[in-house]
Design a protein with these regions (language model features):
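Q-loop/switch helix immediately C-terminal to the Walker
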Residues: 101, 108-119
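Conserved ABC ATPase "signature" region
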Residues: 126-144
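ABC ATPase C-loop
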Residues: 166-167
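Conserved structural motif at the start of ABC-family nucleotide-binding domains
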Residues: 5, 27-29, 90
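ABC ATPase NBD coupling module
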Residues: 75-96
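Conserved ABC ATPase signature
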Residues: 149-153, 157
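Catalytic Walker B motif of ABC-type/P-loop ATPase nucleotide-binding domains
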Residues: 174-177
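Helix-to-loop junction immediately C-terminal to a conserved catalytic motif
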Residues: 58
Length: 251
């Protein structure tokens, strides 16, 4: 099967200009491939570069060396060479991202935030609204809050708005940075089922989970950034159960 994401000899470092120009290496010569329907979890200790990898794939960070290639519609885009317009088009149609924290313009209603990815694609406004309302209902956001800005919501409510926005449209490649971290068990199972459904539709998923049960319930292999590149990928069995069933059986 052809890959949707291919990372080749990727290197990244940060330079702290306020600290005398100290160079902080993140990773060197990182390689990975992800195919449609696959789900890989990025693992490693704090500071290993897990979130940085997702931000690099999303185009938030500049690539130090190597390549990040994404199959985008009828061509392959290398993020190391992509223009700003190409990156924006990738985000609109191919690469979805659920970050750790919700970042939105104040005063924009929660319903409009969830609808926005579908609006950007020029779809039917009524269908976009139905999809957004369905996700908000699934994620147990009370209807009385839909017309309010989520900047006033609790942390868990904000994360559910973030997840609803991330899953409103279908993306061939999804990046999930701790999507269940601040959720109660019931909403966590709902999110795991959304991830499972996206995989069944053919989405490739690159994720970060600190909860081992959630990780096993939704992923087929791990990428350990703390290990040598040749030993980075560690498989574990994916039994094809629904995500909530799998989560219930993981210690």
């Amino acid at each position: 099967m052809d890959w949707i994401l291919k990372v080749e000899e990727l290197a990244k470092h940060f330079r702290l200009h306020t600290q005398g120009g100290i160079r902080i290496p993140v990773f060197e010569a990182l390689n990975l491939e992800l195919c449609p329907g696959e789900s890989a979890a990025v693992c490693g200790p704090s500071g290993a570069g897990k979130s940085s990898l997702l931000r690099l794939v999303y185009g938030n960070y500049r690539i130090g060396a190597g390549a990040i290639r994404v199959r985008h519609r009828d061509r392959v885009v290398n993020l190391a060479e992509a223009s700003s317009d190409e990156i924006l088009d990738l985000r609109r149609w191919t690469v979805g991202y659920v970050s750790q924290f919700l970042r939105v313009i104040p005063r924009v209603p929660a319903l409009d935030i969830v609808m926005e990815p579908l609006r950007q694609r020029g779809g039917d406004p009524a269908e976009a609204r139905r999809r957004a309302e369905s996700l908000l209902d699934q994620l147990r956001i009370p209807e009385r809050l839909w017309s309010l800005s989520p900047t006033t919501f609790s942390g868990g409510e904000q994360q559910r708005i973030n997840i609803a926005r991330g899953f409103a449209a279908f993306y061939p490649l999804m990046l999930l940075d701790e999507p269940t971290a601040s959720l109660d068990p019931v909403n966590r199972r709902t999110v795991l089922d959304l991830i499972s459904a996206a995989r069944q539709q053919g989405a490739a998923i690159l994720s970060i989970f600190h909860d081992a049960g959630d990780r096993r319930a939704t992923t087929s292999r791990t990428i350990d950034l703390a290990m040598a590149p040749e030993a980075a990928e560690q498989p574990f069995r994916y039994e094809g159960r629904s995500a909530s069933q799998a989560a219930d059986r993981v210690p």
